[in-house]
Amino acid sequence: MSAQSSSSESGLNQELGVLVGFDGSELAAQAVRYGAIEAERRKTVLTVVTAYELPTMIYPNMASIPSEPEDDKAKKEAEKTLTEAVELLHDYSGEKSFRTAPGNSAGVLVTLSADAEVVIVGARGRGGFMGRVLGSVSTALPAHAHCPTIVVPERSTSASADSGPVVVAVDGSDTGRVAMFTAAAEAATRGAELELVVVLPAGEEWLYWYPDLELSSEVTSRRQKQLTEGLEKEAATLSEQFPDLTLTTSVPVGDPTETLVEISSRAQLTVLGTRGRGRIRSALLGSVSRGVLNHTEGPVMVVPS
């Protein structure tokens, strides 16, 4: 590899710009291509990292000790994988950096995220996950990263890659508000429209537990109007900081996860907070964020609280 493309385990305090996790899978390659566009858009460096785990070996006798240390072997395999990313970015003219790092992929990316603007990963890697199930890295990383994480799904299409809006889910929580301002900055950078969305749950599921609960179209419409008014106030606040940004608001009624998944198919980016108004505050992703990541039709950015 050239000096520009060399692997490194030092200099972790440098600005990493757009950080992409690469394990050689097709979705990781898709994440690298997405990362190149993002780095070019942000006018920052693109850093691709391949992690490798150090094996714990027990040898019964001296004769069974391999001539090449297992950790050196693991590092060489990672460097070999990383050459695929180098080839993918052969024609990329922006500043780029490639490195290997010891440790599990999620842990490495979480640590490096402290020095990155954004981390990008594929929804699944080579861990054997199939169907609509997130890989372990794309599940753990958004919940612990120090910067926003973008997860690129297999079903992501190019139809809305540049023309669709940036959509952000707003729920009135502090986390949701941070996500809203992050989405506004992202939309401004992309020259895209920003759509603020509050999903109002239909409420039918409560009727089993509260059969005397009165649910009517009038009640729903009244609450929808209240939420719309609140959303328009948030939009007005954003307009003061982003005067050139085109803003729209919507308050659809339905299941939050299903509604946001449907919206993701026409958005160039869907932005979520790690956790919303749920009462359980933990190191886990909120149920809506986790559900959207599992089923999304387009790239999703998760903003840390």
Model-derived regions: residue spans:
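A short acidic, glycine-rich active-site loop
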Residues: 66-80, 215-229
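Short beta-strand elements of ligand-binding domains
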Residues: 122-123, 149-154, 300-304
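Small/aliphatic-rich secondary-structure junction motif
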Residues: 2-66, 164-217, 239-241, 246-250
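Structural beta-alpha unit
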Residues: 1-14, 27, 56, 69-72, ...
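Short, structured interface segments
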Residues: 138-157
